[in-house]
Amino acid sequence: MLNEPLQPQVAATSVILGLGKTGLSSARFLASRGFSIAVMDSRKSPPGLAALQEQNPDAVLRLGGFDAALIAEAEQLVVSPGVALSEPAILAARARGIPVVGDIELFASYVKAPVIGITGSNGKSTVTSLLEAMARQAGRQVLAGGNLGTPALELLEKPVPDLYILELSSFQLETTYTLDAVAACVLNISPDHMDRYPDLDAYCQAKARIYRGTGTMVINADDFRVASLVQPHRPCLRFTLGMPAVDEYGLQERAGETWLVRGHERLLSARRLPLAGRHNLANALAALALGEAVGLPRAAMLSALQAFSGLPHRCEWLAEVNGVRWYNDSKGTNVGATVAAIEGIPCQGKLILIAGGVGKGADFSPLSKPLIQRARAVVLMGQDASRLEAVLASGPPLYRVNSMDEAVVKANVLAQSGDCVLLSPACASFDMYADFEARGQAFRQAVREILSC
């Protein structure tokens, strides 16, 4: 796990590309360790600018583009997740032999406690937060962050815990080489970020980098892409939504009741989990397997499971009025997440889905079958509403709107008693909102307004 950190060199510079939350944490971390830093961003006014100027007034700053001459003199290039590695400046740096790393690689060079790594197309934040709750219930000192919440490098500024839990994106893993996680999991693979990757295989290969270490591999046996990543002679724990093998986690149906099990041993009835949806049963099983891999007591893990109600904007129940239930799944930013929400939300009647935004080059066709089976109607908005409309034309009725307020009004008119209204856009939010949280908050507010009338 422990690697030899790069030492500052006289007159040498660490160049940081991207001045968002991660880039700012990289700048702060390197400057505090004596590195000379330069920070660049293609934007003229990036979100971390004011904080950088306050915290690191001596940092060299280049905005509105990347300074190729300065990059050519760098001792290392620290690339933020939002910057594609196909950028000409990065390709040129690699051709010169300049190390190209990210914040997680820096973290791996300095970390002094065991690390659990969690990635996947969907469920990362839920499993990270659930596992953190399990570790705390077990009395462990734990710090969680990475792609979720606190940047990884900021965790290193705090007292060393018993355990780090990191949510890791494919973009972060692209520039990570030496992280040796004591346990790691790719939760699932479904198409996402196809505007950044040439194909699904390239995206899968980026996710697979989380297994580069020597620790326990936690494997989703139901996902053939994940299952194919198993390495011989590595410790491995599997989970499935079917009946598991003797040393795996899974589900058992008994007398009309679903149980979480390990092998043939029943652990907990699914009815006792506050989390909604079958996809969250997979998240629970993954967390149990990861917890077992690092020695968390089962009783503590099961106790935490029964108390964990989930995260905002992830299949979040908002209200029930006139027999209609409203769910906020704004974090459903890709097709796989939305399919899981459509199939997993408990609904006596039909679904009214609100979807649309920036599709990131995704194939929307996997939405068709579950919508035909479960939806009364689909309300579309945002940049790629026309693409969604073309793909879903043979399914339930489609309605186009121009705003979240209009979407909620239309859904309220369409819904019947027993139905569920689900915001799960299958798209990113940045055509209309700063992030998925802002989109989810707009949905909440629109629901409040329509229900207060």
UniProtKB/Swiss-Prot annotation:
InterPro entries: Mur-like_cat_sf, Mur_ligase_C, Mur_ligase_C_dom_sf, Mur_ligase_cen, MurD
Catalytic reaction equation(s): UDP-N-acetyl-alpha-D-muramoyl-L-alanine + D-glutamate + ATP = UDP-N-acetyl-alpha-D-muramoyl-L-alanyl-D-glutamate + ADP + phosphate + H(+)
Amino-acid positions noted as binding ATP in the UniProt annotation, renumbered to this chain: 120-126
Pathway: Cell wall biogenesis; peptidoglycan biosynthesis
Keyword list, A-Z: ATP-binding, Cell cycle, Cell division, Cell shape, Cell wall biogenesis/degradation, Cytoplasm, Ligase, Nucleotide-binding, Peptidoglycan synthesis
Pfam families per record: Mur_ligase_C, Mur_ligase_M, MurD-like_N
GO molecular function: ATP binding; UDP-N-acetylmuramoylalanine-D-glutamate ligase activity
Cellular localisation: Cytoplasm
The enzyme's E.C. designation: 6.3.2.9
Enzyme class: ligase
The UniProt record lists the keyword Nucleotide-binding: yes
One GO BP: cell division
Major location (coarse): cytoplasm
GO cellular component terms attached to this protein's record: cytoplasm
PANTHER family for this protein: UDP-N-ACETYLMURAMOYLALANINE--D-GLUTAMATE LIGASE (PTHR43692:SF1)
Family per similarity comment: Belongs to the MurCDEF family.
Function description: Cell wall formation. Catalyzes the addition of glutamate to the nucleotide precursor UDP-N-acetylmuramoyl-L-alanine (UMA).
The name this protein goes by in its record: UDP-N-acetylmuramoylalanine--D-glutamate ligase
Species name: Nitrosococcus oceani (strain ATCC 19707 / BCRC 17464 / JCM 30415 / NCIMB 11848 / C-107)
Classification lineage: Bacteria, Pseudomonadati, Pseudomonadota, Gammaproteobacteria, Chromatiales
